[in-house]
Amino acid sequence: MKSMDDRTVGLISASSSRASLKIQPEIGYPRICDYCQPIIELMTASEFARHIRQDHTTKEGGSFLCRYGEHGVCQKLPLEGVCDLDFEAHIRRCHTSSQPAGYSSPTSSLVASYTEDSEETASLRSIRLTSDRDTPTIEKKKFTLHSFTQNLSAVLADPSRSRSDLTTFFTRHWGDSFVPTQPVPQSKRLARLADSAFDSYCQSAGESYRRYQAIKRALRLSHADGGVGIGDERQDAEDLPTIFIDPRFTLGDSSTFSDVFTVPANDDLDALKQTLSGRNVIPATPLEIATNRKPGEFRDYEALQNRLEMMHDVVDGRLAGKLVAKTDDFWQVVRSYSGLQEQLANALQCVMVVRKNLKRVDELVCDQSKKIVEVHERYEQKKKLLAKLHDISCLREAQSTVQMMLSQGDYPKAIECIETSLDVLSKELNGVTCFRHLASQLRELYTVIGRMMNEDFASLIQKELGVKPEAGTMIQAEGELSAVLLGLMRMRKYSFIAVLREEIIEGVKSVMRQVIKNQILNNGVDLNDFDPSLTQLGEPVRRMKHADFLKTVKAVMDEEFYFCKRLEALQDILLETVERANPLHRHGSEDIIVERIEEAKDIHESESDDEVGTTFSKSASSGGFSVGGSALSSNASATTLLSIEVRSEAFLRHVLPLIAEFGHQCAQQRISRLLIARAKNASVTEATTPTQLSECIKLVKEFQSKCDKEGWYSTQNQKVGGLGRSVNKLSMDYIEKFHAARKIRIGNMLDTELWKATDVSIVDQNIVDMAMETGQLRNTKRIDDGPIKKSFKRTESAVTIDSTTSTSNQIQGVIVDEENYVVVGSSITMIQLLSDYCEAISEMPSFSQDWNSRVVELLKTFNSRCCQLILGAGALQLVGLKTISVRNLALAGRSLELVCRFIPMVHDEMDRVLPENRKSLLRYFKQVESEYRDHVNEIAAKLISVIAHYTTNCLGMWDVKGVIPSPEFQQICRHMLKFHNGLVGIMPRDQIEALFRQVHENFKANLREHVTGMGITPHDPLKYGYVTKDYMFYQQNVKNMESCRNLELESLNDIMFE
């Protein structure tokens, strides 16, 4: 903490000092300390030096050690430390200066340190360390392994230690030898390696080393050979006086003369001693040294002569050595010069021969070839001229040739003739005066031919599509049609696609109209009230019988399929013609195609919505109609693509393969209108059965399957197609009307139900019997007789608790697995409706999800309505019942039980047709069945509560007296007998027994409560005996009831002490 405070004070003082001196920013500052954490930013060199003094310096003895470095060791200061003055120089030289330490010497750094600004020097010296106590040592920082390091030199030079301690510093602890006496054992973790492990390495390394030694030896020899020359050359150039080797040396120059022959003023400036190397090959002679002459006087002649002669001898000897060294090279050059002269002479002779031969070749070959080329050029020019004359002659007959081809019906050749003539006029014969009007005439004729071909194509298509061809042929005028199409392709007039589109639509309409007319006439429909021309066919179609209508639909589908096959043949002709017209151009601009498709999307979508409607979205959720056909290969259908104007060959190639598919889609629309026209009559829809509708759907599926095999669903699958959507719409409308009619019927039946037992016909019993035998609920007749009813006896008793009459007549009802169900008429009607739904589900399995929701809704409606009418007493207001009797409750319960018996059959029927991913919808049947059983239990509880209410009231008025049996117990027994008689004949005996067992349990509880309340116990024998007599009277009456004979009744003691 103290060091941090000192550091803060130092930084503050340095900052204030810097601010007072207004020091400009220094180079390399501000900088950070490389070894302090957290990071400290230092603004000036003096501030950085002060930081090193405080945090990175230790003092040992009288020496200062720098710790600013890795592991607290400075690599640029002696380990023994330095004095204070040298330490300042070290900081400036190695740490605070922006110049690298290698460019300054200690002396220069010291001088620079003394020449610095006095105030900065004072500030640096002000932070010198005065004692070890104030020195911030490195031990105060994070403890590391290097914390144990000491400066050995500073320790040995410590003046506080005695001389004996210093002399024995090493030997006192380590001994005299400084060698460990015990060898270090071999590590067990290192594997032992034999010498053979290094054999391969020694071989490869040995070869490399020998190669290296050879190269090194050769390099050393080459350096030894050239070293002398290099040294001599440097010696020759550098140890001679520079004045003599100067290229501008001349004694005529006064300065040069004075430098050579006069004594210089300073001996160091003697020109004869100044050399490049600093050495002088000829030093001054003793005579010259002994001669003492003044500056400016002439040198001693003899001494100068001797010195110059010696220089001359040295130079002469060196030149001689050079010449001797270059002698071999010189004579080699001389010898090679004579051989070079001989080679040049031979080459000159060869060149002369070649030039002579080339001249002969030029005369014999080149001149002849030049003449041949000139003749060929004249020939080509004349040939071109002849071709132009031929073109002129042909152009003169161009119009007549075109007329002749048109008369023969050969449109492609006529167009080719016009195009060729126009091309020749624009290129080869451009500017010919006699043909100045021919181009405009040919263009006009070209336009006329285009109109003619369009008219011919329209007439040919009308003829082909309007008349049914002979057996075995698809296209009658194939040749004429191919010629016209080829001509239109050559002229790039693609408007014939629009004509073809309209003719296909009209052809589809005419085919269906003709088939329907024939079917109406053949079926003998009454036409008195209708137009004889049969322009409006909707009403006659609605008057047809179902079988006749199916035949009509089948005939229309067959004819339309054959019509689409003819369109496919026409499509093949068109594709072949396109390939003949332009066989090389097979790829168009896809960007243009996509753009044109997007332009017509909205138009086609609006048209299809107006024609078919939007009901498909409803049926799509249930997966109504089967999905098949090819996958969508484009974002637009064939109808959309054919509605776009064709402007390029690329787009034409794209839409031509869709002509048959376009015809198929048009046929789907017409068939859809036929089906919708019949469905507009409500009476026809109501009379249609699910079987009849399934037959119609089957015809549609067969037609779609045939078309799918032909590949006519490439741009639109079966479900999205117009026919698929129409069938889904018709089916959903039928399902909705079917359900609404039956829901209204069962609602009306329940609203008018008198809640009395009804007679059951043989037909209804047959429905139940067949369902129990086959496990499938169907509304079919086993016998062909009329509706014969069983003669059941009705009971006119409306038994209530207040009634005075009783009856025990048994009535017969529906027998299900040998169990008789006496029910109301609405439950029988509900069974019939469920059989209708089961039949519809089996006939229309693709709409199973829609049937599932509606049959569940019908079951819930029946259950909830019964609950409202009986338990909610709604029947009192609707049908005028005076009260809801026990018999009404029993009939309602048995009716619900009967319907509940057939819910699993409907569940199984739905399970057979629902797809696997929709099996979860079956949980609604279990939920409905549970609701029915809960309702039946509520009715049973209501019955028990009614009798329990009367018994409780009677026991409340009961008083133990001498009358045996008491009037209250007689009243209880009468109520129970009426209750029993109301249930007999409706509910089975076991159910009645179960009800009375519960009634008896309630009676026991009430009796025990009242007896205990009156304080009667066995210790009061008189009153307890009266109670026992009353209870025995109760037991006897209960046992006399037919359904309760097997009922076990406890004694009074058992009841009281239970």
Curated annotation (Swiss-Prot):
> GO molecular-function annotation terms?
syntaxin binding
Keyword annotations for this protein, in alphabetical order, are:
Coiled coil, Golgi apparatus, Protein transport, Transport
Q: Which domain of life is it from?
A: Eukaryota
Knockout mutant characteristics: Mutants are viable but display reduced brood size and enlarged lysosomes.
* A Pfam family it matches: Vps54
GO CC, one annotated term: cytosol
GO process terms (BP):
Golgi to vacuole transport; protein transport; retrograde transport, endosome to Golgi
Q: Where in the cell is it found?
A: Golgi apparatus, trans-Golgi network
Record InterPro entries: Vps54, Vps54_C, VPS54_N
* Coiled coil stretches, renumbered: 369-389
| Subunit-structure text | Component of the Golgi-associated retrograde protein (GARP) complex, also called VFT (VPS fifty-three) complex, composed of vps-51, vps-52, vps-53 and vps-54. Within the complex interacts with vps-52 and vps-53.
By sequence similarity, the record places it as follows: Belongs to the VPS54 family.
Give the function comment from the record: Acts as a component of the GARP complex that is involved in retrograde transport from early and late endosomes to the trans-Golgi network (TGN). The GARP complex facilitates tethering as well as SNARE complex assembly at the Golgi.
Instruction: Specify the protein name.
Output: Vacuolar protein sorting-associated protein 54
Q: Which organism is it from?
A: Caenorhabditis elegans
